[in-house]
Each structure stands twice: as structure tokens, then as C-alpha cells.
Amino acid sequence: MKKIYFIAGEASGDFAGGRIIRNLKADKELKIIGIGGRNMEEAGNFESLFPISEINLMGFFEVIPHIFRIKKLINKTVEDIIDNKPDILITIDSPGFTYRVAAKVRERLPELKMIHIVAPSVWAYKEGRAAKYAKIYNCLFALLPFEPPYFTKVGLDCRYIGHPIMEQEFYSDKVALRQELEIDEDTKVLCVTLGSRKGEILRHLPIFIPAIEKVYDDHKKKLMVIFPLANPDHERIIKPFLEKVRFNYIFSYERLKSYAVSDLALAKSGTNTLEIAASGTPMIVAYKVNIFSFIIIRLLIKIKYVTLINIIGNREIIPEFIQFNCEANLISDKLKELLLNPQEVDKQITESHKILQELGFKSNIYPSYLATKIIRQEFLK
């Protein structure tokens, strides 16, 4: 029986990995092991070597306090791979962790077939990483159509498979969703996403909550706030910040429903912005990192925007409030402006949809099936 070792370090990778594992096991008996979240564990019928929350860290300086623990986890993962002797190693995103594991494994198992899913953003910064990946991996799966040339020119086999959000089922009946959640027709619904990392949540709550309060002051009882959560532990982190708020709020564990039912979203930068746009909901994006991390990012990065829709469109389709502009007054003013300006909202939705179509939204591109086909035909012979 063939054995595949998967590694995913965050929720989006777990989602993509779960889909691929299900497809692979549909017509072939395989043993799946590795590191993943609930989706991958259920699809592969395995127990993760350790919880993915252990490696779900972001930012240069945010990682420093955990660096020795992360090194131990890297070494633990490498030894587990060596002990299990898989036929294929498949890593998904989380480059800070997965690349280091793959590099160490390559030294000890030079013949092992290795695939990485989610190309590192070399078009944004550190283009030299492409050559480093070419030395380690046999194949790279890219989510964006313009990425393969960056890697093929340095000798790495890179295939465009499309973005995983393209195969999700999005909700379109806002009226039915409002009835399901018992939300009045004239109540404005604001969706607030805080991220999947504890550090992100703690960093953004002190900014987002005052911004929401200012919006509430204009709408009073006609405002409902939804916090979509991926992890029940996050509810425990958030609740202390909400003890004295004046606005009504609910927690939801169905993020796509949360996006679709909302009139507007205040979103942290990330994959969630594509899902919100695909749900037909306008948004603003706000994000803040450690100041030292920000300085390093600004020195390295060569793109103007952080939101993928803006990056591809090369203009600010979705308003961004990043770092020093991630400030409650600025955020609340823009939220109120969008709530009162349907023309601006319609323009954002229309332009976002055009960008999503460029990415294959509502097309016949099914990333997990394309990935499965390549793995099955070329690596599981």
C-alpha cells in the first residue's frame, strides 16, 4: 500500500488537503499520515502528529519567542517522516515551516518524491526563493495563473491548478439566510473576521471593537455583528473584549453563511477576502503586524497592495487600512460611508467579481481534482 505524508499548517491548507486526500482515496487504497487539521484527519483517517495551531504563526518578530519550540517541531516532523518512509511528501503552504522540513528531509531521503501546494509569493518579495524551491521539490502547484513562469524558468515543474475557493459552494439567498438567523430585514449586518491565529485576534480586537462601536452609534439597534470563527477556542479569547460593548453580536461556525448574510464586512487580510467577495459582500480590509515585522516587510516587499483582488487588479478595488492606517476612526468612517453609499458598494462588488472570474470563479476549474489527477498519474504509478 502506498503511503503519503501530508503537512498543512493552517486552516486554508487543511481545507485543500482534506479535499485532495478524499479524492485520492476514492479509487485507491492509501495510507495517509502527517500533520493537518480536522478536515485532513477525517479524510485520511489519521491523527495529526501535533495540532496545526502549534505552527500557525505569522510575522518575523512574532515567531521569535517560539523559535526553539518551532525548531523542535521541525526536527520532530523530519524524524517522523524518516521513520515512516513515505512514497510521497506533500506540503501545503506555511512555507516558514514546510520548506525547512522538506529541505532537511531532502538531505536524508534524496530520492523521495516531494510536492508543494501553494506557490510562495515570489512575485511579491524574495524572488530568489524560486530557485531554492527548485532544489528541494519535484513539483509545485500554483493557485494563481501568473505564477508558474517564476518557477519554470529556474527548472521547477510548476502547474497551475486554480484557487481552492473556486470549488466551494457559496450562498446567494440572503433573504432566506436572514430568516434562518432571525435577523430583521432592516437590520444592517456587519461581518468581522479576525484571523485564525491568536496573535492576529489579540492585535486586531482593540482596534476593531471601537470602530464597530462608532458605526453602532449611527445605527443603534439596527446593527448586528457576526464573528465567524474556525476554532471554538477563539470564542473564549474574544468574549472578554465584548463584555461591555453596546452592539448586538453572534458567533458563527459557518463562515460562508456569515459572509453571505452580511451587508458589509470588516476583514483581516487573507484568503477570507476572496470568500467574502465570492459571497457578493462588500468589505474593507484592515491588518496590523508587529512594527519590526512591518519594517522588514516594507523593505522586502515590492507590491502596493495586500489584498489579492487589489494586487491582481493593480488598483484599490477594496479599501485597505494597513498598519499605521489600521486605526479605529479611519475604519469606522469608511464602514459608515459604504453603508450609506450603494453606488460605491455596487462598484466594488462588480469589479471584485471580474477579478474572481480571472481566477476561474464559477468555471470548470476544480483545483483539488487537478491536483489529484497529477499526483495519481505522475507520482503514484
From Swiss-Prot:
It catalyses: a lipid X + a UDP-2-N,3-O-bis[(3R)-3-hydroxyacyl]-alpha-D-glucosamine = a lipid A disaccharide + UDP + H(+). Belongs to the LpxB family. It comes from Rickettsia bellii (strain OSU 85-389). It is an enzyme of class 2 (transferase). The keyword Nucleotide-binding does not apply. Pathway: Bacterial outer membrane biogenesis; LPS lipid A biosynthesis. It holds the Pfam family LpxB. Its EC number is 2.4.1.182. GO terms for cellular component: membrane. NCBIfam families: lpxB. It comes from the Bacteria. GO terms for molecular function: lipid-A-disaccharide synthase activity; phospholipid binding. This is Lipid-A-disaccharide synthase. GO terms for biological process: lipid A biosynthetic process. InterPro entries: Glyco_trans_19. Keywords: Glycosyltransferase, Lipid A biosynthesis, Lipid biosynthesis, Lipid metabolism, Transferase.
